[in-house]
Amino acid sequence: MSRRRTAKKRIVMPDPVYKNSLLELIVRQVMRNGKKLLAYRIMYNSMIKIAEMTQKDPLDVLEKAIRNVTPLIEVKARRVGGSTYQVPLEVLPERGTTLAIRWILAACRKNRGKPMYIKLTNELIDASNKSGSAIKKKDEIHRMAEANKAFAKQRF
């Protein structure tokens, strides 16, 4: 057990253009080496491209993509005796959103050759249509949790 106090939740201010805090969370994950302006440019170009390709509101596509990729359960390693079990646990909403963003960006970074905003656009559109690498990752996690359901009583 940690002897420190629990960390206070930080309030995420919405982004300046779309006034959306989810978009700001994604920008913070896209950002590398403190280059937030570049992260904003990637995200806004991606939003423009989504609007062109789908003829829908890009914020709706973004929220639907995040909702589709957000996991409900995950597995965590737990040592009991000498063996390690993969124990399925429910995911809190904040952690689920963070995992979804992380998986979408990991899927984008895995592909090489195209600019980041195009990769992000394609991945978000795929995720909103329930396909793509991030959805596969979510399904894999859910399958692993289903396989280890027997260890659910080994809670933390």
Curated annotation (Swiss-Prot):
GO terms for molecular function: rRNA binding; structural constituent of ribosome. GO terms for biological process: translation. The keyword Plastid applies. It is found in: Plastid. Its main location: plastid. HAMAP family: Ribosomal_uS7_B (MF_00480_B). PANTHER family: RIBOSOMAL PROTEIN S7. One of the primary rRNA binding proteins, it binds directly to 16S rRNA where it nucleates assembly of the head domain of the 30S subunit. Belongs to the universal ribosomal protein uS7 family. Part of the 30S ribosomal subunit. This is Small ribosomal subunit protein uS7c.
